[in-house]
């Protein structure tokens, strides 16, 4: 980074290591290929012990794009990465299933007030509390991974329902549809979301009717991913 805004430092101190990415002005030596040609760079310190060990052994920062094909369902296990990328990568570090499941929260700290570009593993409410509610939702053109309207999409068509009753009704008029409802436990829902969608594809399910969780805590991230998966259909 060429500079670290005070909001980025505050969030990093509170949430790192953990699933938070802060967008800050990039340093001049950072290559455009790392930032997609943008003047900003996303920084994160993950909490997984295997990744922390890798960073310590390497002794510097790593440019680490997502290990999945563009627009498709994110991987949460080493097997998912192998299935998606095959021989395109030489090695896969296997640290077990991702404990959070959904990606990191991305906060753009180059604007005032900061904007949550992508809800994720750090709930929006926690970000707002740390910034004393001086935070805004994403606005303007795409500036980070996962901001496109259609993303995280399985082969199966995804339909959204606001309740279990509505989900059953939608499933009844869509032959071959299955209902996905983990709204009773948001932590488990986030952890298994992508694996559930991948499992539906593995079994040849043509339509997934997903019950939207409440818009609180990890529910923000789950709703975001399901809405983007549904937009692809």
Regions from the PLM with identified roles:
Residues 1-233:
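Active-site-adjacent structural elements in enzyme catalytic cores
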């Amino acid at each position: 980074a060429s500079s670290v805004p005070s909001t980025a430092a505050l969030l990093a101190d509170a949430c790192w290591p953990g699933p938070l990415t802060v967008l800050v002005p990039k340093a001049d030596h950072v290559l455009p290929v790392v930032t997609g040609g943008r003047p900003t760079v996303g920084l994160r310190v993950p909490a997984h012990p295997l990744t922390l060990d890798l960073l310590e052994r390497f002794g510097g920062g790593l440019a680490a794009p997502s290990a999945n094909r563009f627009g498709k369902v994110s991987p949460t296990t080493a097997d998912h990465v192998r299935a998606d990328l095959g021989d395109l990568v030489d090695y896969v570090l296997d640290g077990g299933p991702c404990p959070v499941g959904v990606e990191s929260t991305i906060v753009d700290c180059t604007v005032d007030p900061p904007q949550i570009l992508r809800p994720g593993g750090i709930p929006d409410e926690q970000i707002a509390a740390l910034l004393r509610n001086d935070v805004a939702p994403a606005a303007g053109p795409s500036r980070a991974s996962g901001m496109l309207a259609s993303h995280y999409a399985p082969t199966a068509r995804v339909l959204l329902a606001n309740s279990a009753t509505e989900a059953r009704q939608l499933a009844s008029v869509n032959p071959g549809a299955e209902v996905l409802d983990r709204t009773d436990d948001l932590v488990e829902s986030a952890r298994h979301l992508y694996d559930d969608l991948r499992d539906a594809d593995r079994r040849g399910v043509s339509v997934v009717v997903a019950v939207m969780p409440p818009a609180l805590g990890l529910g923000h991230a789950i709703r975001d991913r399901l809405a983007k998966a549904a937009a692809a259909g």
